[in-house]
Amino acid sequence: MVYKMVVTPYLFKEIIAIFQNTSDYIIALETLLLLSVMWIIFHKRDGRSFYISGDKEITVNYEPENLMDIAVPQHSFLKTHLIRSKVGKNVSVDDYYCLNLATHNYLGLLEDKQILENACRCIRKYGVGSCGPRGFYGTMDVHLKLEERLASFMKVEDSVVYSYGFSTISSAIPAYSKRGDIIFVDEAVNFAIQKGLDASRSTVYFYKHNDIADLERLLREQAKRDDKRAEIDLIAAAMEWTVGAIGGFCVGSHFIVEHQRLSGLGYCFSASLPPLLAESAISSLKRLDSEPQIFMELREISILMNSKFSTFSKLKLGGNKLSPVKHLYISENRDNREVEHELLNKVCGECISRGIAIVQACYLYKIEGNPIRPSIRITANRLLTVFEIDYAFKIIEDVSNEIL
């Protein structure tokens, strides 16, 4: 038998040749790696022994950090109000029967008996929930009827319904606008739009509030940088202020709506609108079609309230005269926002005790961009009478003069 063995001198020559052909950097790196592995393998860690007495001492001295900031006992958010009735034209707040100027019910449809009966009938048929998102067993026939009705009412091709008004616009914006796109936005847009802009990661240019000239300036500057593109039309709105339901919708061309059904986060991943609310919205739209004069009734009430409330002694009225939402600011601008907030909170509380339900407008001052001054929010309702508006004015005027 013949054995073939590697000659030792030849082996050493091969190793030397490898080192000669390898750069100094590689040799140093591999040497450092080898030393590190050897240190990890052979290094002995100092064992730490724990005793029961030591564990008890650690447990006794342990002071966990607060999960959230400590609340100030005097904070206005801790002084909640208890509602004991349906929130309609009148409402019971903390056992005070009040004329409601606080909540959004512009057309007064929350108290419509026919809409209530239709909602109750829908509960008996479908129950109170829809059991999932629209793409996962959450679509009922009433959802499709509502979308068809909305498209017809708005005179567009198609519509898509969301289960929550806030998620409507905050989902619609990132569905169409991505990184690299440009959006021009009013600097005073609401928080839902702000969240949609953040989610889109687009380049955002803010123009001055309600200043069309400033918007035109930004568009002209952008036109110099870009070629003209086709117009895309999308209308988004919430149903929570007018039609006596909850949710929101987007309407536009069929192409626009279909894209949102695939890309709208609130549509794809949130539970769909409860069928009873979809039925309520359908009934409200039928009412709006059959009685268009209720819009004119609301318009007249809004103008009347604007005319009356603009004469407060120590409060300044803000908002368009045709808008059903009014804001009352302290006439003398205080430098401290907290002081204004506390004073207006006292005004609201005293007005409730005298039979007028009003609230402060709420903002997330640490999160929202360009937050507005503290104010009292007043909402119009077409069911209000001239006597009730005069009575509300007198109470608010008396209370503001006493506190401010």
Protein language model annotation of sequence segments:
Residues 105, 202-230:
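Active-site phosphate-binding strand-loop segment of PLP-dependent enzymes
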Residues 179, 199-201, 313:
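Short, structured coil segments at secondary-structure junctions
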Residues 228-322, 328, 334:
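Active-site C-terminal subdomain of aminotransferase-like
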